[in-house]
Amino acid sequence: YLEKDELAGVLGELHERARTQRAGQIAGWPARWQRMAGLAPADKAAADVRGVVWRDEEGRARGAVAYRLQEIEGEFRATLQVRHLVADSDEALRGIWSFLVHHDLVNRVSVDLRPVDDPITWLVADQRAVTTRIHDHGWLRILDVPAALQARTYAGTDLEVVLGVTDPLG
């Protein structure tokens, strides 16, 4: 487990490394990591935030999660609510997921804003126990379409694509 100050730093550091591996990810900012780690003064759930880091054999942080347990009234169980989960390697991601799904006295893990290809469905024995929901999150307006497309790399670059864009605002 990590102290909240350390958790905020690790989340930011890992996000910066991991976001370059996935198109469309944006940079984070210190206030975001402080909020995820439970350091925001207005956060009513801040006291309940916990953090865990997954380290490789050299001791480097490769995955981390900020979460809180929400007790289910009348039961001796809780829902584990993930605030932020980040990993810069497949092994670290599997390690963090393993920690979450094997947490004591938890009968539900709730995670928002995961990629559609997140491997959790394939990491559990009962795939029917995993429920996913797809919804919009990041919206953006690309002002320079050619520059945006040229900044990416593409597999199978022998392909030629013609793209038309109509934007009444410019």
Predicted regions located by residue number:
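Intrinsically disordered, low-complexity, positively biased terminal segments
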Residues: 2-170
